[in-house]
């Protein structure tokens, strides 16, 4: 098993990696999107606007000759909020979630960092192969394996989407394409630079078959130098001290599953971290952001 080094956030913020002289932080300039008519004032966004969040995943693309850094960012399924439980037809209570913008179409966004600023440019909305838009709404009333009601801000229950996607990771394919991990599937979806779906890998057809019983579990996406795509399963077959890493060869559809050990001394007893994102560093190495409740947290 390769050596895994875990660095707490406080230490990571104050310690620079070898060869790095400084770290700069940028607030990305993003456009404001409009909530559906009639919902302004009913949300925590009284003006009826919300920023297009492009930080669900981030992938480095290139550096231009003038020093401009080019990244690609990914939105998630759109703005949501917890909602009060609702009763179904049998009178049983089930959890609910507000979808503030039910027609939201997830996007891939180019981000340029230059002259001390980071700007989001040229958002590309995701569509299926017939150019019909994907939606951030679930296909059915579930969030992973747990049923929940989909509500508008007017407390009206919404039907699921015919083309659902919940983007949770982005990787750049050098053949003018992107790969996106879809938590709803779970699936890996390939898109053209114009945002049109080219290919999709599902459990049993490019992804390990056991993932079919674990919807809602995939997080992050990286592309290794050998072309394999790497994503994380937030669960690990019942093993509390491990997460699962899935590696997929897109051309042959071969896949492997590995165990990623969780440092027990860092996280609060009885909890495990989520994977925020991961980036390939070369030589088979991954830089992974783990998010969780610290051991000494109140």
Identify what each model region corresponds to.
Residues 1-298:
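Sequence/structural signature of beta-propeller domains
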């Amino acid at each position: 098993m390769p050596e895994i080094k875990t660095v707490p956030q406080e230490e990571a913020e104050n310690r620079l990696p070898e060869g790095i002289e400084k770290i700069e932080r940028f607030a990305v300039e993003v456009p404001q999107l409009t909530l559906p008519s009639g919902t302004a004032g009913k949300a925590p966004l009284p003006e009826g606007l919300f920023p297009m969040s492009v930080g669900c995943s981030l992938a480095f693309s290139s550096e231009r000759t003038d020093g401009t850094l080019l990244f690609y960012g990914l939105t998630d399924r759109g703005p949501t909020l917890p909602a009060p439980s609702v009763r179904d037809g049998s009178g049983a209570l089930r959890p609910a979630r507000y979808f503030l913008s039910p027609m939201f179409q997830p996007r891939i966004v180019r981000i340029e960092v230059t002259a001390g600023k980071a700007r989001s440019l040229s958002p590309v909305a995701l569509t299926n192969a017939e150019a019909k838009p994907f939606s951030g709404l679930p296909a059915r009333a579930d969030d992973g394996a747990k049923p929940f009601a989909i509500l508008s801000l007017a407390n009206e229950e919404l039907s699921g989407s015919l083309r659902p996607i919940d983007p949770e990771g982005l990787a750049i394919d050098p053949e003018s394409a992107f790969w996106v991990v879809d938590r709803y599937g779970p699936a890996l979806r390939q898109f053209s630079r114009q945002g049109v779906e080219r290919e999709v890998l599902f459990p049993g057809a490019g992804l390990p078959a056991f993932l079919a019983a674990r919807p809602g579990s995939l997080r992050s996406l990286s592309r290794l130098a050998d072309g394999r795509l790497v994503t994380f399963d937030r669960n690990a077959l019942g093993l509390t001290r491990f997460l699962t890493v899935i590696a997929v060869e897109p051309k042959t559809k071969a896949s492997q599953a590995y165990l990623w050990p969780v440092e027990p001394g860092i996280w609060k007893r009885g909890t495990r971290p989520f994977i925020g994102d991961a980036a390939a560093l070369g030589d088979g190495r991954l830089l992974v952001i783990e998010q969780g409740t610290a051991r000494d947290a109140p």
